[in-house]
Amino acid sequence: MSLKEQLGEELYGQVLAKLGEGAKLVDISDGSFIPKEKFDAVNSEKKSLEQQLTDRDQQLQELSTKATGHDELSAKIADLQKANEEAKQAFEAEKQQLKYEHALETALRDSGAKNPKAVKALLDTESIKLDGDKLLGFEDQIKALKEQEDYLFKGTEPNGGVQGTPPPGKGADLGGLPTKKNPFKQGPDFNLTEQGILFRENPELAKKLQAEAQ
């Protein structure tokens, strides 16, 4: 049973209204980022809806007591209680996912990523866990990515050079350009995501690497 079916059209619509037109409550984990104001609004709305579910639980419990001896009514109440519990669990899981996505977005922006969504695609997000306010496993991956793909980040690069100008000896195999591998070259380095980022962020570099890969 979907979350929409569990909550009903009215409650589900309230949350969608907070997310904005075209949003899908169950699609928070698809990689799209959520602005802080929307995060706060939806998080507040979730708390309100969770309270409504708790109130329903209490009402169903009271009805269950009164329905003693009425098997059919008791069975229907039991089904409603089960659906209510599933809805609460779905709310909790989705709230945690929302917090995770918001924390990851913030961490990516703080890391200096030029395009947070593109950099996220290069991370193993399955191994990054949210523990309270900390993202476990994020720093190690970002550090490694900055060393390997420094052109994806703003400011001074971790290899010691200034963005777009690597120190002597760095990227020599690619004409002195700030990258250690060619994403256009067939083989283990071939990467369509990085190609797209290069064409958007540095078209000249993209053309040069593309020509060298032929």
Swiss-Prot record:
Organism: Bacillus phage SPP1 (Bacteriophage SPP1)
Region (Disordered): 154-190
Coiled coil segments of this chain: 36-105
Keywords: Coiled coil, Viral capsid assembly, Viral release from host cell
One Pfam family it belongs to: Phage_scaffold
Name this polypeptide is given: Capsid assembly scaffolding protein
UniProt subunit comment: Homodimer. Interacts with the capsid protein gp13.
Task of the protein: Scaffolding protein involved in the icosahedric procapsid assembly. Coassembles with the capsid proteins to form the procapsid, in which the scaffolding protein is found within the external shell of icosahedrally arranged capsid protein subunits. In a subsequent step the scaffolding protein molecules are released from the procapsid.
InterPro entries documented for this protein: SCAF
Family listed: Belongs to the SPP1-like scaffolding protein family.
Any one Gene Ontology BP term: viral capsid assembly
Lineage: Viruses, Duplodnaviria, Heunggongvirae, Uroviricota, Caudoviricetes
